[in-house]
Amino acid sequence: MTDATTTDVLVLGSGIAGCGAALAAAREGASVLVATKAQQPADASTDWAQGGIATTRDDPESLKRDILAAGDGEADPEAVDALVGDAAAAVEDVLVDTLGVPFDGEEGFDYAREAAHSAARILHVDAATGHHILGPFLRHLDAHENVDMLEDAAALDLITDEGAVTGALLDRNPRTGDRAETGVPVFAGSTVLATGGIGDLYRRSTNPRGSTGDGVAMAALAGADVTDAEYVQFHPTAYDDADPFLVSEAVRGEGALLRNADGERFMPDYHEDAELAPRDVVARAVAAERDATGEVRLDVSPLAFAEEFPGLAEACADRGVDWETGIPVAPCEHFLCGGVAVDTVGRTSLDRLFAVGECARTGVHGANRLASTSLLEGLVWGLRAGETAAGDDRAPAPSEPPELRDRDPDLPDGFAAEKFRRLRRVMDEHVGLRRTGADLQRAQGVLRRLKGEVDSYARTRTSRDLYQLRNAAVVGLLIARAAGENPESAGCHHRSDEAAAEEAPDAGH
């Protein structure tokens, strides 16, 4: 076992939520260690965020109404109040004053409007807002005397002691030439999960590869509460390809139209807000029209696309897409609205453990996330959790970490790839945009068997790939089980058998 490291606050993840937690804790004088499994800390979901970050401007109540409406009755008003109450100050203090993010606008900020927003309130930088936030954030933290950063350091498991989380075990692949190490214990006064999303559970996702739900899985296995796992959001307009890229909501906000293979605009038939309807509505409509006619394209002719969205125009050119004839789009996995249950400062049900960002269920999003609120939620909850974690002033409490097998990076050829193919196939086919009770039961059976195979193999060796497979299987099971236990459609959880279940004589029994 490698010598242990101690720190006041351990942050697992280097996106906007993890950076926010690290900044707030460091400002309180705490020692902070940020560990990310990415080879570069900037390889986080935040860096892929396009559209922007919503703020309240001078009307927090209208943002609250829009969030609650998008959440389809499942959002927590107290959590939404916390978000809109902190929004303006957090954006101004951190993003504008501290980091100097170059938001678009020559004289003042250029606020954009996106789907399901009643007003223009979204700050953006081209269609690469996350990239322009995360780079300055990481550089600022790297220069902070209270913050240390570890890249290519994956958390394998949380360390617990009598119901409290006392740190985590890391798998390290240092770039310095030092030997790789597995089972490196880091003991912390408080641990903050900021591990991002679950995109690797699906064949097509807007998330970076490696988004295997690690924080949700580790927390669940340690005994933390996980809620609303069924609410997996599918973005309606990703490039229709095996390797998709996101076509930001902001493009529709500027006037782009959705047309089927017959050239017909169809969204007015599905919702009064047409292309600016909530994401779940647009995603199901796009899927239906694509199934019926063979293709859906985003018509960008109503706007000066290359001038307003040069990054997206370049992405189209790189793929050989002639955007002047429309961009082929289809829904793909985008965001987990549920996750590790937390309160308004990011506390989980386990002592000393916090969760922020996409791995957390704050209650803000309910059954469906409003466009451009993920960066804001990550920032606000990161700041709240970091300040609270540092304020707890708990000394690291070294305890006995779980024993790991010898490190074995050499899995049988194709082992991890084959298991992930099976997992993604069952998630796509049975736990996707449209669901039935029978499909969800089938998925649970396959995922249980897959997890059993991975667990059996892991009894004799340790590998980062094995732990990521385990995490993906655990989270897949949590999603399928929650979806199966919720027969009512809401937001991005759509039960296509709901009407039949309501008509059946034994419904509800």
Curated annotation (Swiss-Prot):
Main location, first listed in the record: cytoplasm
The reaction(s) this protein catalyses: L-aspartate + O2 = iminosuccinate + H2O2
Record protein name field: L-aspartate oxidase
Residues of the site described as Important in orienting the L-aspartate substrate: E114
Purpose: Catalyzes the oxidation of L-aspartate to iminoaspartate, the first step in the de novo biosynthesis of NAD(+).
Cofactor(s), names only, from the UniProt record: FAD
Family to which this protein belongs: Belongs to the FAD-dependent oxidoreductase 2 family. NadB subfamily.
Region (Disordered): 389-412, 486-509
Cellular component per GO, a single term: cytoplasm
Pfam families assigned to the protein according to its UniProt record, in alphabetical order: FAD_binding_2, Succ_DH_flav_C
Biased composition range(s): Basic and acidic residues: 402-412
GO molecular function: L-aspartate oxidase activity; nucleotide binding
PANTHER family: L-ASPARTATE OXIDASE (PTHR42716), L-ASPARTATE OXIDASE, CHLOROPLASTIC (PTHR42716:SF2)
Keyword entries, A-Z: Cytoplasm, FAD, Flavoprotein, Nucleotide-binding, Oxidoreductase, Pyridine nucleotide biosynthesis
SUPFAM superfamilies per the UniProt record, alphabetical: FAD/NAD(P)-binding domain, Succinate dehydrogenase/fumarate reductase flavoprotein C-terminal domain, Succinate dehydrogenase/fumarate reductase flavoprotein, catalytic domain
Gene transcribed to yield this protein: nadB
Free-text remark on how the cofactor is bound: Binds 1 FAD per subunit.
Catalytic center residues: R279 (proton donor/acceptor)
Residues that hold FAD according to the record: 14-17, 45-52, 214, 358, 374-375
GO BP terms in the entry: NAD biosynthetic process
Pathway: Cofactor biosynthesis; NAD(+) biosynthesis; iminoaspartate from L-aspartate (oxidase route): step 1/1
Alphabetical list of InterPro entries matching this protein: FAD-dep_OxRdtase_2_FAD-bd (IPR003953), FAD/NAD-bd_sf (IPR036188), Fum_R/Succ_DH_flav-like_C_sf (IPR037099), Fum_Rdtase/Succ_DH_flav-like_C (IPR015939), NadB (IPR005288), Succ_DH/fumarate_Rdtase_cat_sf (IPR027477)
Listed Acidic residues bias regions: 499-509
Localization annotation: Cytoplasm
E.C. no: 1.4.3.16
